């Protein structure tokens, strides 16, 4: 709720200025209403104290739940960075500048001008770093799985390539055999035709129709023989 600023508590814990529309957390820290709204803009709840990260509102709902500051202590230590100008108190380094990631002390906040700098609490940055680390691990696992699948695909492609080459060699061999057979049968047919032509010269009175029928029968037998041979080779 909005409270008037007293003389001893006239500084917002976030912007280090006199609070405008001051609000006070249950832990006793005072803030500007705009600073608190800005601090909690990315939060869905629970809403801890921006200064000490104490979840006093959450403890009222869940009494057995430990304070947020204790639950995130390890993450705060992992994300903490040294002060840029020397040692400073822990309370003065609760915020990190969004621009360069360095700790944001009270002096920097007071010298920032009319508009306060972009800041965020250290524990929130620690949580985000933990989430990013988990995402990196998932991406690394997906990459390893993709490499394994790629290796399996290459092995399968090599096996199928070997099968195709074997079938190609076999088909080429069968083609050469079939072509040699056709050449041999063609020579045999020409020899038979020459013999029939010589016999017809000796017998001038032979009927041309009979000669044509005999020649046609020889051609049919040759085609049948070729067809049977080709079919047998294809079925091997």
Curated annotation (Swiss-Prot):
TM region(s), chain numbering: none
RING-type Zn finger ranges: 12-53
GO MF annotation, one: ubiquitin-protein transferase activity
Catalysis performed (reactions): S-ubiquitinyl-[E2 ubiquitin-conjugating enzyme]-L-cysteine + [acceptor protein]-L-lysine = [E2 ubiquitin-conjugating enzyme]-L-cysteine + N(6)-ubiquitinyl-[acceptor protein]-L-lysine
Keyword Aminoacyl-tRNA synthetase in record: no
The record's account of how the chain is modified after translation: Ubiquitinated; undergoes 'Lys-48'-linked autoubiquitination in the absence of growth factors and MAP3K1-induced 'Lys-63'-linked polyubiquitination. 'Lys-48'-autoubiquitination leads to degradation by the proteasome, while MAP3K1-induced 'Lys-63'-linked polyubiquitination results in the stabilization of the protein. 'Lys-48'- and 'Lys-63'-linked polyubiquitinations occur most probably on the same 3 C-terminal lysine residues (Lys-195, Lys-224 and Lys-225) and are thus mutually exclusive. Other sites of ubiquitination are not excluded.
Modification Phosphoserine occurs at: 200
Family annotation (SMART domains): RING
Tree of life domain: Eukaryota
Positions of crosslink type Glycyl lysine isopeptide (Lys-Gly) (interchain with G-Cter in ubiquitin): 195, 224-225
Keyword Metal-binding: yes
Entry text on domains: The RING-CH-type zinc finger domain is required for E3 ligase activity.
Subunit text: Homodimer. Interacts with JUN, independently of JUN phosphorylation. Interacts (via C-terminus) with TRIM7.
Protein name in UniProt: E3 ubiquitin-protein ligase RNF187
Source organism (scientific name): Rattus norvegicus
